[in-house]
Amino acid sequence: MAKTKDKNEWGSNLSFLLAMIGSAVGLGNIWRYPYVLYSNGGGAFFIPYIVAILIMGIPFLILEYGVGYNFKSSFPKAVKSISKKWEYLGWFLPVAVFMILIYYSAILGWDGFYVIISAFKGWGADPNAYFTGSFLQANDTLGGLGTFVPFVAIAMLVGWVIMWVISHTDLEKGLGRVSKVLVPLLFAIMIFIVLFSLTLPGAGIGLAELYNPDWSLLLNFNIWMAAFGQMIFSLSLGMSIAFTYASYTKDDSDLVSNALWVTVANCGFENFAAIGVFSILGYM
């Protein structure tokens, strides 16, 4: 399949690498993975987890890279170039990603607002009551789910504007530069949080509870499904993100080593985050 050249490409392999790490590392690593690890055998979970990395995570990421690199186009266009009558199937993934982005933008809006009020602990003595009552203004009725909260809407709007500006800027000057700043900053913040959490009283209790292995679960099919599911979710496999990013790589890009580094960074981050989460839970 001949490649269609696109002048808009990554300025360096580092930009591509950090952008891919930024797309992989996210809320699933911080919120989801610690729970999955704990509820699926603790330390025993690492066996199916490593197997999932080796036979699904790395190979499928390389596959997405290779296909995206070859077609040098969006996923719908790639499907169209194979068969025009199946082009509509190619739009399912971008639409799915957009739907995910909608609820992610809401969570990011919450996070942005909490960054501001964290300076003076604006949630008061009862954080749960503040979040559901004052912040979301939710109640037990069905109508309470649709309450319009102006400051949350503003926070979401700011997020959408930022994303629009970045996505409508030259790839290297926009997403490339942003990734070079925000991805290292994210890792630096997480390192600080985890190191601090390890100094808290009871941190060892939380870690012992997290990593206490239940070897009997290795015979349970569900733990293996959880490991492979986490790998798909964490690396965003099959969502056309890696496909799209790889379509903007230069001809001499080393896609295999990039896939290895992305997998190592992603899996390392979520395991590091799990240490911080359960250290804090042990303290609580």
Regions found by a protein language model. Name each.
Residues M1-W31, F60-Y65, Y69-S81, Y88-W91, ...:
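Membrane-interface "cap" regions at the ends of multi-pass membrane proteins
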Residues V36-P127, I232, T244, W261-Y283:
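Membrane-interface helix-loop-helix modules in multi-pass membrane proteins
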Residues N13-M56, W215:
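Transmembrane alpha-helical insertion/packing segments
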Residues G26, V97, Y104-I107, D111, ...:
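Helical transmembrane-bundle signal
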Residues T4-N8, V36-N40, N70-F92, A106-E172, ...:
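Inter-helical loop and helix-membrane interface segments of multi-pass membrane transporters/permeases
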Residues L17-L18, F46-I47, A153-L157, L260:
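Hydrophobic alpha-helical transmembrane segments
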Residues A2-L14, G176, K180-M284:
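Membrane-embedded translocation segments of transport machinery
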